[in-house]
Every structure is written in C-alpha cells, then in structure tokens.
Design a protein with these regions (language model features):
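N-terminal nucleophile
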Residues: 1-242
Length: 242
C-alpha cells in the first residue's frame, strides 16, 4: 500500500508520497510514485496509489505520448480538467489488459494530479481507478489516496482555504510521519514536491529520508510538542496528585 497527499494552498501546491511497496512481509521494495512534468507554460505533478503495475504503465504511457508529440498528452491538454480526463482514460486502458478477468482481479490505481497552466488557476484533482475524477472541497483544499486514515486528522485540523504553502508543506510532512508511525505498509523515502503559484516550474523536489534535517526538524518538534502539551493537561479529580 502507499500514502499520498496533495494540498492546494493560497500560493502554491504541495505533494508528498511514500515509496514503499509490499507484497507480503518478506517482499518489500522501494519505488517512486511521483511523476513531474515541468515544461514551458505548465507544471504538472502526479502521485499514485494502488496496483504498481498499472501505475507504472500509466506513467510509461504518459512518457510515450510526450515523446510522440501527437494526439493527447500533457502538453496538448488545454486545462487540468482535460489532464485529469486523459489520466483517467490511461488508467482504464492499463488496468484491464487483454486476458485478465477484471471480475476477479483488481488492477486499478488512483492518482492525484495538480499544478498550474499559464493564465489559469492552481488545480488539484483525484482520478479514481474507474477513470472519473473530482476536485477537493473549497473548505478543505486537500486530497489523499492510499492509507489515508492515519494522516488525515492533522489535515482536517490545519488545512483551510487560507493556508500558506509553507504551513501546507509542514502539515504534509507531519501527515506522512503520522502514517509512517502507524502503518508498516507505508515507508520512506518520501518524495516531496512544492510548486509556487505563477512560477511554472517546481520550486522544490526532494527525496527525503526520516533522518534528513528538513524532515526530522518538523516531525521531531511536532512529536515533542505533543508530549509537552499532553503532560500539561488538567488532572481528573480522582487521580492521585501526590
């Protein structure tokens, strides 16, 4: 399994995805689940969760379409709605190869895609395995896929329409760290990408281990703060106050 988060802030977009893939306790591998297209008038970031074979096939199809420079590709799509539709069609095509009984075998993947095309607003979409897609709620401008239950609470508390890209970045790392601590199927290194509004190039793209300073400073301080606040809570009247 995996965990991916995308956050649309006022001044940019943040993506984070883990890179652990498991096929049983004795078969754990590392694969990047992030795809970045940063050319000309647009920046597009994609992360994926689900069947690894399908996800890699979709990414390969995107690369091949860009090389052929004909038909539909990330450069010819007029807006992110078309990009989401394009990824959805590739997802359907690659999740049901010939000879596979789709009634008994689940080969679907889901994708988060976001960024900006020049002259258009920041966009963020979730593309489902069935090919359809959604945008985040205006009141909660983030989307998550994969093992979402551990990293979602901090997002619900912190991420608002007014959130800055810096706070969104810190929240994304804390959300990822919360998931790593509770789910063994999610693991480092963490692919982390930041896009700033109207720049049309990636501001930062890194592969972070939990010992890297940029990651550990935020997550260690968060953990320490939780312990300090918890220890300061008022005591119940039935507790021994000695």
């Amino acid at each position: 399994m995996t965990y991916c988060v995308g956050i649309k802030a006022q001044d940019g977009i943040v993506f984070a995805s883990d890179s652990r893939t498991t096929a049983g306790l004795d078969n754990v591998n590392i694969y990047s689940k992030m795809f970045v297209h940063d050319v000309g008038d647009r920046s597009v970031i994609i992360v994926t969760s689900g069947n690894l074979g399908t996800s890699q096939a979709v990414y390969k199809s995107i690369e091949n379409d860009l090389k052929s420079d004909s038909g539909t590709n990330l450069n010819t799509c007029k807006d992110f709605d078309q990009i989401a539709s394009y990824i959805g069609s590739l997802n359907i095509k690659n999740s049901a190869p010939k000879g596979i009984n789709t009634d008994t075998v689940l080969l679907g993947s889901s994708f988060l895609v976001g960024g900006q095309i020049k002259g258009q607003p920041l966009e963020l979409y979730l593309v489902y395995s069935q090919g359809n897609y959604i945008k985040p709620a205006v009141s909660k401008p983030y989307l998550v896929i994969g093992e979402v239950k551990y990293g979602k609470p901090i997002l619900d508390r912190v991420i608002k329409p007014s959130v800055s890209i810096g706070d969104a970045s810190r929240c994304a790392l804390i959300s990822m760290d919360s998931t790593l601590k509770s789910d063994l199927t999610v693991g480092p290194p963490i692919d982390f990408a930041v896009y700033k509004k109207d720049e049309y190039k990636i501001a930062s793209q890194k592969c972070l281990n939990i010992t890297d300073t940029e990651y550990s400073k935020v997550c260690d301080q968060w953990s320490d703060s939780i312990f300090k606040i918890f220890d300061s809570f008022p005591r119940f009247d039935w507790e021994d106050n000695k």
